[in-house]
Regions:
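A generic structural signal for short hydrophobic patches within well-formed alpha-helices
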Residues: 1, 30, 111-112
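Active-site neighborhoods of divalent-metal-dependent phosphate/nucleic-acid chemistry enzymes
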Residues: 61-110
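Short, well-structured N-terminal submotif of metal-dependent ribonuclease cores
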Residues: 1-26, 40-53
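Histidine- and aromatic-rich ligand-binding microenvironments
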Residues: 25-26, 85-87, 108, 123-126
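Aromatic- and histidine-enriched alpha-helix N-cap/loop-to-helix transition segments
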Residues: 25-28, 92
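Active-site-proximal, substrate-binding regions of enzyme catalytic domains
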Residues: 9, 34-81
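Short loop/helix-cap segments at secondary-structure boundaries that form the rim of catalytic
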Residues: 112-118
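Short, structured coil segments at secondary-structure junctions
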Residues: 59, 100, 118-120
Length: 126
């Protein structure tokens, strides 16, 4: 998301093209994007209101969250799949996408194995 929104990012063109038709994000991805946009280094950070406006304008207001029953089993699902540490956040993203039948687009090759272990469809942006 940050790469798609940031012309200075080395993967901007590929990410922007790949995310062109995306209109909803897993809730955790949306929060991470907002967090990053408002804390980027070297004067690149934007005001909170602008970050919210950009994200809503680009990806809409729809977020993909976990249904109640899956939220109640979140930690068990991560443990059963052998997901641990920081990869737990990737696991949350995977479960949110899977619950809505969405395919994850990523530049993060490392996260791909977590997404797959939890049954989420994913594609690496090239």
């Amino acid at each position: 998301v940050i790469a798609a929104l940031s012309a200075w990012h080395e993967q901007h063109d590929a990410a922007s093209t790949a995310l062109r038709t995306v209109r909803a994000l897993p809730a955790h991805v949306l929060i991470e994007a907002y967090s990053m946009l408002t804390r980027l280094p070297s004067g690149l950070a934007v005001a909170p209101a602008l970050a919210a406006e950009v994200l809503a304008g680009r990806f809409g207001e729809r977020t993909l969250g976990l249904p109640d029953d899956e939220r109640d089993r979140l930690i068990s699902a991560l443990a059963d799949a052998g997901v641990l540490g920081g990869a737990s956040y990737d696991g949350l993203v995977a479960l949110e996408a899977r619950a809505h039948g969405a395919t994850l687009l990523t530049l993060d090759e490392r996260a791909r194995s977590t997404y797959r272990r939890l049954g989420a469809d994913c594609s690496v942006i090239a």
